[in-house]
């Protein structure tokens, strides 16, 4: 499916809705991205889910922070239909196959997001593993400590 790519004001992107599944931002990566941006390097668009009112950031927290740090006012974004919950679900698998590698703590947090949710925790270990980009064994270990 093809989604609209649009330049969004950074101030229009919601980053405070629990859609960041990393434990913390990597300050070195943010700095590196900011330096590259000032040199004209073009980054892929961030991914946001738009519910008609808010643009919920699902993937691209380091790029958004780097953009803010260098004083940019906008960023290219891929706009997908959906709400905060959709963005949160998407975010658990963000960077599983590309971008800044996730730490083991990041992976555990992604799985925990699903296991702590009333609906999502009913899903099979396989489904959660596939969505989070981790092994089924990892999900099982977190589900049954």
Language-model region placement:
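Short secondary-structure capping/turn micro-motifs that flank functional sites
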Residues: 52, 83-84, 145
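Basic, amphipathic alpha-helix used for nucleic-acid engagement in HTH/winged-helix/SANT-Myb modules
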Residues: 82-101
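Generic alpha-helical segment signature
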Residues: 26, 85, 104-107
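Exposed alpha-helical structural elements
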Residues: 29-32, 87, 91, 110, ...
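Short, charged/polar connector segments at secondary-structure boundaries
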Residues: 1-80, 91
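Generic secondary-structure transition motif, activating predominantly at the C-termini of alpha-helices
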Residues: 17, 37-41, 96-97, 115, ...
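Alpha-helical interaction elements
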Residues: 97-145
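Residue-level "edge-of-site" marker
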Residues: 80-81, 142
């Amino acid at each position: 499916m093809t989604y609209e790519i649009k330049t969004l004001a950074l101030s229009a992107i919601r980053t405070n809705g629990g859609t960041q599944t990393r434990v913390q931002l990597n300050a070195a990566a943010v700095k590196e991205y900011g330096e590259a941006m000032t040199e004209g390097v073009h980054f892929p668009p961030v991914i946001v889910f738009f519910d008609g009112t808010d643009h919920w950031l699902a993937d691209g927290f380091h790029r958004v922070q780097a953009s803010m740090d260098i004083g940019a006012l906008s960023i290219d974004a891929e706009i997908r239909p959906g709400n905060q919950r959709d963005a949160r679900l998407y975010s658990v698998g963000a960077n599983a196959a590309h971008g800044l590698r996730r730490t083991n703590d990041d992976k555990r947090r992604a799985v925990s997001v699903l296991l702590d949710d009333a609906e999502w925790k009913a899903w099979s270990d396989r489904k959660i593993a596939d969505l989070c980009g981790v092994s089924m064994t990892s999900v099982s270990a977190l589900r049954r400590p």
